[in-house]
A protein has these predicted regions:
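Catalytic Walker B motif of ABC-type/P-loop ATPase nucleotide-binding domains
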Residues: 151-155
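Helix-to-loop junction immediately C-terminal to a conserved catalytic motif
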Residues: 44
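ABC transporter nucleotide-binding domain
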Residues: 169-263
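Conserved ABC ATPase "signature" region
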Residues: 1, 93, 97, 104-122
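C-terminal coupling/interaction segments
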Residues: 263-309
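Conserved ABC transporter NBD signature motif
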Residues: 52-60, 68
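Conserved catalytic motifs of ABC-family nucleotide-binding domains
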Residues: 147
Length: 309
């Protein structure tokens, strides 16, 4: 797929293909410029590729966009799509009419959607008076009110505080599972992505780096990480020196008398511990730690950037 701006054609996405099944959430991850927003906008019909092919549920994203929109729920990042001076209920009524809902069917859809997202008590409240978390829930209600088969959620928790974001994410998971929906979600809050234990797609400069389970990503790419805590500064200093001299071992960070190291895949831990033999009397604790997703992705994308063109 190629999206052409005014001055110069840019290949925004290249051979990006993956499947998301019913009841499954797929997290689309990548740095700025990776192609996440372009991908979402093409799938929902807001951007037309100048070449290439995109499909949702077997429908062509360009020639059959109407059929896709009937079956797809879209939650954009910001509140600009909400009519701020209208009530929550009237916002949904307006959107429902655009989806072809009328009369009793429309009113039932409005009330059901408000109930699902916990906003029924503020149905008559103007949107401009709502908190950012409630606005995010209203956007979610709008995305699900016509009972779609697919949900596309672009940074749904971006403007929401951590407590509200946690509740919103749990709500999304419940909606996807109970409705047996296929969902795409993007987020810069990588702790949220990790909490989903979901299917993950990694994009970089419009290309697909990885498509699979997060656990598979860790098995394929993750290196063993160790934390060592010492009872004296001298033991800490000696160990840091020895570790820095070992091939295949990288000192990630040091805090007080603790050292965090990454061991290259395929490197045995035996020689590492043997090198520390003279400092073992000062070693208080040795533990293997799970690497935060943000560190794992930073390593992946850092490797990509270092690769020759």
């Amino acid at each position: 797929m190629i999206k052409s701006p005014i001055r110069k054609p840019v290949q925004a996405l290249q051979a990006v293909s993956f499947e998301v099944g019913p009841g499954e959430i797929c997290a689309v991850v990548g740095p700025n410029g990776a192609g996440k927003t372009t991908l979402f906008r093409i799938l929902v019909g807001l951007t037309t590729p100048t070449s290439g092919f995109a499909s949702v549920l077997g429908y062509d994203a360009v020639t059959q966009s109407v059929q896709i929109r009937r079956r797809l729920g879209w939650l954009p990042t910001d509140d600009a799509s909400l009519l701020q001076r209208l009530s929550c209920g009237d916002n949904l009524r307006f959107h429902g009419r655009l989806k072809g809902l009328l009369g009793r069917e429309l009113e039932t859809a409005v009330q059901d959607a408000l109930e699902v997202v916990g906003l029924r008590e503020v149905a008559r409240t103007a949107v401009l008076t709502l908190s950012s978390g409630m606005k995010a829930r209203l956007r979610l209600a709008r995305a699900i009110m016509h009972k779609p088969q697919v949900l596309i959620l672009d940074e749904p928790t971006a403007a929401v505080d951590p407590v509200g974001a946690h509740g919103l994410l749990n709500l999304i998971v419940d909606i996807v599972r109970q409705g047996d929906l296929a969902a795409l979600i993007s987020s810069h809050r990588l702790d949220e992505i990790e909490a989903l234990h979901s299917h993950v797609v990694l994009l970089n400069k419009g290309t697909l780096l990885f498509d699979g389970d997060l656990d598979d990503l860790r098995r394929d790419i993750d290196r063993p990480h160790l934390e060592l805590a010492f009872g004296s500064q001298q033991g800490f200093l000696d160990a840091r020196t020895h570790l820095a001299e070992l091939e295949g071992v990288e000192v990630i960070r040091t805090i007080d008398n603790e050292i965090h190291v990454a061991v290259r895949r395929g490197v045995s831990l035996g020689p590492v511990l043997l090198r520390l033999e003279n400092t073992l009397e000062d070693l208080l604790e040795l533990r293997q730690v799970k690497v935060p997703l943000r560190d794992l992705l930073a390593e992946i994308y850092g490797t990509v950037k270092r690769d020759p063109e």
